[in-house]
Amino acid sequence: MSFIIACEEGKRKIAEILLDKQEVDVTYTDEKGRSALHYAAHHGYLDIVKKLVLAGADVNYEDHQGETPLYFACLQRQKQTVDYLMEQGARIDIKDYLGNSLLHLTARTAQLALVQHFLKEGLAVDGLNNEAQTPLLIAVAYKHRPIIQELLSHGAQIDASDKSGDHSLILSVRSNNLPITQLLLEANTSVNHTNDQGETAMLVASINGNRMISKLLIEHHADMFLSTKEGISPIWYACTHNQKELVSLFLDHGLDVDYSKPAASTDSEFGSFIDWVENNQGKKNNFNTAAPYAGETLLHVAIKHGHTAMAKLLLDAGASINKLDDSGNTALHFAAANGKKDIVKMLLEHGADATLINNREQLAIDYANMNGFNEITALLVEYSPTTKNKPSLKAVPAKEKASESIGQDISSKKQALLDLKELLDAGILTQEEFEVEKKKLLA
């Protein structure tokens, strides 16, 4: 082991003495399968490398990971040692245990001269390692622009993808590298390529919140509507995560401010956010609201997540305030159910209709009452006094509405009186208002 240690540590004199005495087997390897030549090449000790080769060391001997002295020299950018070993017949068509060729290795370490040499010598420009990565994908991942340009000039497939389905553009966007992203787009990469998760470069840019790259992608016709298998598109992601600049960018490039999700068989077991509210009263379950439900607009989604500034941006852009989702819910239903007083107030000030009922014949005020949001109830009564007369928890079934014009039965009157009493106890109605409404019911 002393000879290998001497070579590894660059102790030239000791190595020379041992070699001169011919007491050393230069083919001896350590527990990793590495010879003295591996270590000398790794450190770039050219004089020792030459003595070992002259003494009979195998320039193509592979250690337990398939790495040769030439591989070690390339790994550490030992250009002179690399040149010498190749002069001595070192093979360049080797791969390590991960399947990386010398072209993969030099692309990762940004050794342009060696990349050019290996390409000239015929190494496959689109060779794959065990992860199906090409040298181009490696160069993009490590942000080596000159290497990328060299590989492309030799015909590298720009849209080759790895085992995850990621291609060069997705990798460059994921690393927030604007210059390389622009280079790839100018080289006509597929801007709407999707990986195995259904992610596009546009979605990755949205996840990163990178407005500059998002703008560049849109200018190259990236599709902002493409969704993952879970129904997440750049639009919904930006709105869900309160990325106002990105939503503004999308609106500037043609997104309809009332854009909504169409009905689909892949929707959750719950029909809507409101359904979840009703099924989880008093619980602390986390509602998975990453994807929108059928019919939900951008405004619904912003309010569902409590994003006041996003809701204001959409309203200022002309969003329809009373638009319904497929369950008949307005944005006001969402805000009331979510306990967002400021948003409720903003919606009412923008003309939200508090008298609209959903498919379950519930008003926004019903959900405020259901969850004990008394201040929101007061707001809704203030802006729409007619809601005071409606039962707070259950709506009157549609088949009974015709008979209400003639008179209510005893049970419905009793329920209405109880509801009025709740409003009185909560301080929402004064005693005088209570008496007036009571007389109306009993008339």
Give, region by region, the residue ranges found by the protein language model.
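Ankyrin repeat boundary/linker residues
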Residues: 30, 63, 96, 129, ...
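Conserved ankyrin/ankyrin-like repeat signature
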Residues: 14, 48, 80-81, 114, ...
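Ankyrin-repeat-protein effector appendages
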Residues: 2-5, 121, 154, 187, ...
